[in-house]
Amino acid sequence: MQSAMKGIACLGLLAALCSVWGVAAQEPARHAVGLELRGDTMIYRSVALPCRQGTGNHVWSGYAYEPWTPAQKVFALSKFWSEARRNYVRMDRVGAERWDSLYLSLIEPVRRTRNDDEFYRLMQRFCAFLEDEHTFVAVDRNYPQSAESFGDGWVLSLVTIDGRVVVNEVARAKAAEVPPGSEVVSVDGRPAAECLAGAMLRVSASNERARRYKAAGELLRGLAGTEHEVEFRRPDGSSVRVRLVNVSGEYGDSDLASLPGRDRRSLRAPFRLEWYPGDVAYVKLGSFRPGSAVKAFHDAFPEIQGRARKLILDLRGNGGGRNRVAAHIMAHFSHDTLLCEGTWRTRTYHAAYASWGAQAEAKDTVANPPVRAGFENYRGLALSEPRPHEFRYAPDRESLVVPTVILTDVGTCSSAENFLIMADSQPHMTRIGSATSGCTASPVVYELIPGMHCGICTREVRFPDDREYVGTGIAPDIEVVPTLADWLEGRDPVLERALEYLADK
């Protein structure tokens, strides 16, 4: 509940910028209605709204959609509120009354949003309060905006490391001015840490580490024409100020300079096989989605099985995919015929039970299952009994069991975490790196209004022995956290530690 209160407090503190910092207005506005938290009560207050350069009505001239009406916006807010209240599996951690209070406080600010993007950002903040990576609000509209691409040929990819926002990739033609590894010091005169905190408010994630990880890429997002004055500190200690202007759409695969070994193609590779001395196979598993990655793994497995004496499975940045794919790959590295991805439960509701529990109090539920069922259903607290999620495999299948290290980081999430749950019971497997994202899966998807939909997490997953990881992440057996100095030197200390560990096996 403390995390829920913290989420409310943060949202309440910064939602005074409900006009949404860094976006364009279709209509001029001098004030915006914001929110303020006093105790458990959300109240309104007005704040001055500064205008920004380069954000006029012309931005929307090529927008191909009819803007959402105030009525549609309020309906979308209400639809998301009600479906989350009914389906979100961790609503008991949030508190239904607080969720209701926040919803009521947002009705007027939502109605007054001045354009579609401003409304979308406010919906993102509402969603982020639930603190779950598989609970989201998304749009199908081509907003005239960008996050990494800017005028005059600028492309910047930002990441967080050592608590700082750093340039991971930059357009090669601009690399002499802002080299990879340069730190963002300020944006429009505001400290980078403050700007990052604002971006984090719109990020749906299970903990602060994951929010920070995802928010870096959103730091400079803005509608076309939005100007940013960004101060960078180069790796050599010198400083430079750059004027960046958002464009409409991203440039895609441009010619980029990156930190050594951290180009996006390598980091996002769905599959890669490399060999290290001593017949140590390094296998990059960047995704568990069906398709080319699975085929590449199957094509390479005979070589791995025939040669590898030790194994490194790199799941860093693996955002998941299908649980069945994760289990299928795990089956190649285990002799077990039964693989368990943990136990899961979901929200349940019986209207008749709720009617019987309307007058019940907590003390009445002690040693009284029928009353307890009524009490929980009336208050939206009823959950299904935990069920194991298991996969069975033939005992005579092709598999390879050798000393194995699995590399993880905060980008390891969803079915990649289910893979780690299965690995937890394998004595030959060890986790090295940093804690994972801490999110589960199975979002139920609803259309809110034409052009906007949401997903709401419906399953809570735990280890078979009932250990929790949702919200905190799965900790490694051996923690190794890279530093900016490592990246600048082209070192991968996590991989280095894995090789050291396997050398003794």
Language model: regions and residue ranges:
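Extended C-terminal subregions enriched in glycine
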Residues: 403-425, 429-437
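A substrate-binding/cap region within the structured catalytic cores of diverse enzymes
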Residues: 277, 335-396
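Cysteine-dependent hydrolase recognition
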Residues: 368, 372, 378-387, 395, ...
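Flexible, low-complexity junctional segments that flank or bridge functional domains
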Residues: 25-311, 315-345, 353-362, 403, ...
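Short helix/strand-capping connector loops at secondary-structure junctions
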Residues: 472-484
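Short, conserved helix/loop micro-motifs enriched in His/Cys and acidic residues
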Residues: 392-407
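Bacterial N-terminal signal peptides that target proteins for export
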Residues: 1-11
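Bacterial N-terminal signal peptides
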Residues: 9-20
